[in-house]
């Protein structure tokens, strides 16, 4: 058993922002990583050079999701964790059919984690008590809704609910939790006015950066007891 290879952590949407930071964090710890990505970024080549297994995937169809799952299975016989980071933020807007917006949000935030959790369940099980993890990235809007991103908020709320359902299904071998962030990082194109307005929405008045999320994930992965819970990383924003 001591010579058994480490099981990789699977991170969906690992080519940018939090997913990318997580991948590099684990690689620094000599933890094997598999990342999914849709578009080729320079960061993907950097991950490859650092030792990550990078798999291009299209989650816009169920077939693409299941094809990705089969590729993962061909690369490893076990998984330490699945971190569902892949996301899209699409608002209702004139010219785009509402049904299309809803379908897109449900596809990436509900179909993908639902199908992957089922398809890869066997890779997470069989390694002992609380030896596997699934982490869903939801959003603080699950609590309050959103008048401009209704489909997005609804899809993240569905993912939040699935956290508890999968926790019931997979315990005690696999823990399943959710992280509900608000503003973690600015985009480069965000101007000063937008940044100040965004900062004022939280009680803590800062942008914490990826480390706040990384530290929480490290805690969840090392816990032997916490499952079926959602953790807000929002600076008290729902209270403001």
Curated annotation (Swiss-Prot):
It comes from the Bacteria. It catalyses: (6S)-5,6,7,8-tetrahydrofolate + NADP(+) = 7,8-dihydrofolate + NADPH + H(+); 7,8-dihydromonapterin + NADPH + H(+) = 5,6,7,8-tetrahydromonapterin + NADP(+). The keyword Methyltransferase does not apply. The active site is at 152 (proton acceptor). It holds the Pfam family adh_short_C2. Keywords: NADP, One-carbon metabolism, Oxidoreductase. The keyword Oxidoreductase applies. GO terms for biological process: one-carbon metabolic process. Its EC number is 1.5.1.50, 1.5.1.3. GO terms for molecular function: dihydrofolate reductase activity. NCBIfam families: PRK06483.1. Catalyzes the reduction of dihydromonapterin to tetrahydromonapterin. Also has lower activity with dihydrofolate. Belongs to the short-chain dehydrogenases/reductases (SDR) family. FolM subfamily. This is Dihydromonapterin reductase. It comes from Enterobacter sp. (strain 638).
């Amino acid at each position: 058993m001591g010579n058994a290879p480490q099981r990789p952590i699977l991170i969906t949407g690992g080519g940018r922002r939090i997913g990318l930071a997580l991948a590099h964090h684990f690689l620094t710890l000599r933890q094997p990583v598999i990342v999914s990505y849709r578009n080729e970024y320079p960061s993907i080549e950097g991950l490859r050079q650092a030792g990550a297994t990078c798999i291009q995937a299209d989650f816009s169809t169920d077939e693409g999701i299941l094809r990705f799952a089969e590729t993962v299975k061909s690369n490893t016989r076990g998984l330490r964790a699945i971190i569902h980071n892949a996301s899209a933020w699409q608002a209702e807007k004139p010219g785009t059919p509402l049904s299309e917006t809803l379908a897109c949000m449900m596809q990436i935030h509900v179909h993908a984690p639902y199908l992957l959790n089922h398809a890869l369940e066997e890779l997470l099980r069989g390694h002992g008590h609380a030896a596997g993890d699934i982490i869903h990235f939801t959003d603080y809007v699950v609590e309050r809704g959103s008048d401009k991103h209704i489909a997005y908020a609804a899809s993240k709320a569905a993912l939040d609910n699935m956290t508890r359902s999968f926790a019931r299904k997979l315990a005690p071998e696999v823990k399943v939790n959710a992280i509900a962030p608000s503003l973690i990082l600015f985009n480069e194109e965000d101007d000063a006015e937008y940044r100040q307005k965004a900062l004022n929405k939280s009680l803590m008045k800062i942008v914490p950066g990826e480390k706040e999320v990384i530290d929480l994930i490290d805690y969840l992965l090392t816990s032997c007891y916490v499952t079926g819970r959602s953790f807000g990383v929002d600076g008290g924003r729902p209270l403001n």
